[in-house]
């Protein structure tokens, strides 16, 4: 029986982070968590990290598709915050964004991890961006690091 498991060090990897500017004060903390994890735990060199800012979370998939198609990056981390308002608009944004990112990831065989918060209120967003509930940007970075290594090991098994 073959088993593929992997670590979280990926020092020679290139990672793109797409950050929504909408709800920037929360997304800034998610980004800081992701960057800290990539550099400190993953040993990723700063020059191998590309940060791209977009207007909102809904715009992230367009850029993710462009990056994925380039073949230059080992993973993408999506960072954004969607907070429920008075209408169901946030559901459509959240569903469309996550579905699109999942489709792009599968189409290009590229890990795309979600550091996107979908919360009922601003307090929940703050809690998940570095206070009580940890930092979901950091969690997304950890997932990206592990997936990079899993994909590298899987390619060796499949292609060699």
Swiss-Prot record:
GO terms for molecular function: 6,7-dimethyl-8-ribityllumazine synthase activity. Keywords: Riboflavin biosynthesis, Transferase. Its EC number is 2.5.1.78. Pathway: Cofactor biosynthesis; riboflavin biosynthesis; riboflavin from 2-hydroxy-3-oxobutyl phosphate and 5-amino-6-(D-ribitylamino)uracil: step 1/2. One of its GO terms (biological process) is riboflavin biosynthetic process. It is an enzyme of class 2 (transferase). Pfam families: DMRL_synthase. The active site is at 89 (proton donor). It catalyses: (2S)-2-hydroxy-3-oxobutyl phosphate + 5-amino-6-(D-ribitylamino)uracil = 6,7-dimethyl-8-(1-D-ribityl)lumazine + phosphate + 2 H2O + H(+). 5-amino-6-(D-ribitylamino)uracil binds at residues 22, 57-59, 81-83, 114. It comes from the Bacteria. GO terms for cellular component: cytosol; riboflavin synthase complex. (2S)-2-hydroxy-3-oxobutyl phosphate binds at residues 86-87, 128. CDD domains: Lumazine_synthase-I. Forms an icosahedral capsid composed of 60 subunits, arranged as a dodecamer of pentamers. Belongs to the DMRL synthase family. Catalyzes the formation of 6,7-dimethyl-8-ribityllumazine by condensation of 5-amino-6-(D-ribitylamino)uracil with 3,4-dihydroxy-2-butanone 4-phosphate. This is the penultimate step in the biosynthesis of riboflavin. This is 6,7-dimethyl-8-ribityllumazine synthase. It comes from Buchnera aphidicola subsp. Acyrthosiphon pisum (strain APS) (Acyrthosiphon pisum symbiotic bacterium). The lineage of its organism: Bacteria, Pseudomonadati, Pseudomonadota, Gammaproteobacteria, Enterobacterales. The gene is ribH.
């Amino acid at each position: 029986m073959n088993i593929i498991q992997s670590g979280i060090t990926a020092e020679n990897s290139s990672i793109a982070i797409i950050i929504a500017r909408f709800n920037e004060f929360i997304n800034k903390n998610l980004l800081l968590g992701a960057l800290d994890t990539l550099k400190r735990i993953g040993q990723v060199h700063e020059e191998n990290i590309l940060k791209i800012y977009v207007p909102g979370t809904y715009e992230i998939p367009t850029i993710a598709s462009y990056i994925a198609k380039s073949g230059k990056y080992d993973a993408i981390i999506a960072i954004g915050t969607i907070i429920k308002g008075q209408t169901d608009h946030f559901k459509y944004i959240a569903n469309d964004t996550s579905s699109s990112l999942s489709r792009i990831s599968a189409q290009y065989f590229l890990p795309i991890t979600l550091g996107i918060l979908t919360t009922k209120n601003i307090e929940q967003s703050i809690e998940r961006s570095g206070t009580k509930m940890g930092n979901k940007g950091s969690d997304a970075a950890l997932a990206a690091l592990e997936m990079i290594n899993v994909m590298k090991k899987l390619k060796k098994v499949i292609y060699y």
